[in-house]
UniProtKB/Swiss-Prot annotation:
It comes from Blochmanniella pennsylvanica (strain BPEN). Its EC number is 6.1.1.21. GO terms for biological process: histidyl-tRNA aminoacylation. It is found in: Cytoplasm. One of its GO terms (cellular component) is cytoplasm. The keyword Protein biosynthesis applies. The lineage of its organism: Bacteria, Pseudomonadati, Pseudomonadota, Gammaproteobacteria, Enterobacterales. It comes from the Bacteria. Belongs to the class-II aminoacyl-tRNA synthetase family. It catalyses: tRNA(His) + L-histidine + ATP = L-histidyl-tRNA(His) + AMP + diphosphate + H(+). This is Histidine--tRNA ligase. InterPro entries: aa-tRNA-synth_II, aa-tRNA-synth_II/BPL/LPL, Anticodon-bd_dom_sf, His-tRNA-ligase, HisRS-like_core, HisRS/HisZ. GO terms for molecular function: ATP binding; histidine-tRNA ligase activity. PANTHER family: HISTIDINE--TRNA LIGASE, MITOCHONDRIAL-RELATED, HISTIDYL-TRNA SYNTHETASE.
């Protein structure tokens, strides 16, 4: 047997998630999937590795993601490839390839790992996971409102809605931003001494990114800077006004943040973020916006679009921070543990357990394997905290009976095999009583 090399560790900023962790992951993902499905969104899957040029064309070369954060490599054929730093570009590329956007509306969702070479810290990792939704082919503010409503519904279902607030802005059209960019540069040039090194680096290449600076001195300076909303084109102004009216009608609270711009170049018009102060410092849990030009920019037919991405690690941190884990107790442990004593009973235990699963597919039933004595089997059962233990010995196997031990009520009974499922259904209040389609 090979010895484990103590020096082999996970890559910095990339984490293992054990069964005790994935319970919460699965719970969150199932809620998000169920909500997206109820709105008619369908899953799409695409590779985690893409051609590097895809991200350079979509995200913008003068961005932190492209300049500093991408995992790039060259394969054996000399192709320049990248581990995806975000999902929208790959989703659009896949949609173009398979003709999803040609005179069609599409509502899609996906989840999976993304990769950015950043300094690891709480809630920010080099491999992180996003749950995202994208809607293609709809130009009006009503689809913007729908995506925001979806996220609001997700927070409520997860029990974190009181710890999140919505921030909105419109960054207008490309021509709007070009006009504003000139005014912003002129203002900043008069205040160079108040700019930090990052702001100075971005001054002429991507000055709008200075608006979301974390530097206190630069933030104070920007209070007197020109505001992007004053330079919006009429179409963007009307679009944003109608979106705000819709959110007011729908009862979704929000704050207009004139400094919200997002870090990727493909955005236009609506941008939004759900933020929290419950993690010590202000953190973005979810971000999104419109990208009406991206499909055409990447070689497809013109298709307006909007999407959002939820950072799953940050959602988990927030749930843990506010101690909202009571929702998981029912999912942590199994319902039934099956103990068997003797070679013949083990075979019959497996047969009976499969019949029970076919009748009660939602039942969490674990069968003990390996022929341990009854003391060891009960020890293993107790680790999983079942409500019911089923016990089958050789006599039970012969007369087709089973011992049902209710650990909660501390009662015990003997049942015929064909009566076990109905009894479990009654004790555990299982409502689903369907049969497997095999």
């Amino acid at each position: 047997m090979l010895k484990y090399d103590k020096n082999i560790q996970s890559v910095r900023g990339m984490h293992d998630y054990l069964p005790k962790d994935t319970i919460l992951w699965q719970y969150i993902e199932n809620i998000l999937i169920t909500i997206l499905d109820s709105y008619g969104y369908k899953e799409i899957r695409f590779p985690i590795i893409e051609d590097t040029n895809l991200f350079k064309r979509s995200i913008g070369e003068v961005t932190d993601v492209i300049e500093k954060e991408m995992y790039n490599f060259t394969d054996r054929n000399g192709n320049n490839l990248t581990l995806r730093p975000e999902g929208t570009s790959g989703c659009v590329r896949a949609g173009i390839k398979h003709g999803l956007f040609y005179h069609q509306e599409q509502r899609l969702w996906y989840l999976g790992p993304m990769f950015r070479y950043e300094r690891p810290q709480k809630g920010r990792y080099r491999q992180f996971h996003q749950f995202s939704a994208e809607a293609f082919g709809q130009i009006g503010p009503d689809i913007d409102a729908e995506l925001i409503l979806i996220t609001a519904r997700c927070w409520k279902k997860l029990g974190i809605n009181h710890h999140l607030s919505l921030e909105l802005n419109s960054i207008g059209s490309l021509s709007s931003r070009i006009n504003y960019r000139k005014k912003l540069i002129t203002f900043l040039e008069k205040n160079l001494s108040n700019l930090d090194s990052n702001a100075l680096r971005r001054l002429y290449s991507n000055p709008l990114r200075i608006l979301d600076t974390k530097n206190t001195k630069t933030k104070e300076l920007l209070l007197n800077a020109p505001i992007l909303s004053d330079y919006l084109d009429d179409d963007s102004r009307v679009h944003f006004s109608e979106l705000c009216q819709l959110l007011n009608l729908l009862g979704v609270p929000y704050r207009v943040n004139p400094y919200l711009v997002r870090g990727l170049d493909y955005y236009n018009k609506t941008v939004f973020e759900w933020v929290t102060d419950s993690l010590g410092v202000k953190k973005t849990i979810c971000a999104g916006g419109r990208y009406d030009e991206l499909v055409q920019e990447l070689g497809g037919y013109s298709a307006p679009a909007i999407g959002f991405s939820i950072g799953l690690e940050r959602v988990i941190l927030l749930i843990q921070e506010i101690n909202n884990i009571s929702i998981l107790h029912k999912n942590i442990y199994i319902d039934v543990y099956f103990i068997s004593i003797g070679d013949n009973s083990r075979k019959h235990a497996m047969l009976l357990s499969e019949n029970i699963r076919s009748t009660l597919p939602s039942l969490r039933l674990m069968v003990h394997h390996g022929g341990d004595d009854i003391k060891k089997q009960f020890y293993c059962a107790n680790k999983h905290k079942p409500q019911i233990v089923l016990i089958m010995n050789e006599k039970n196997a012969l007369d087709k009976t089973i011992i049902l031990k209710n650990l909660q009520s501390k009662t015990q009974e003997i049942l015929k095999h064909d009566a076990v499922s109905e009894r479990l259904k009654h004790i555990l209040h299982i409502t689903c009583n369907s049969t497997d389609n095999k």
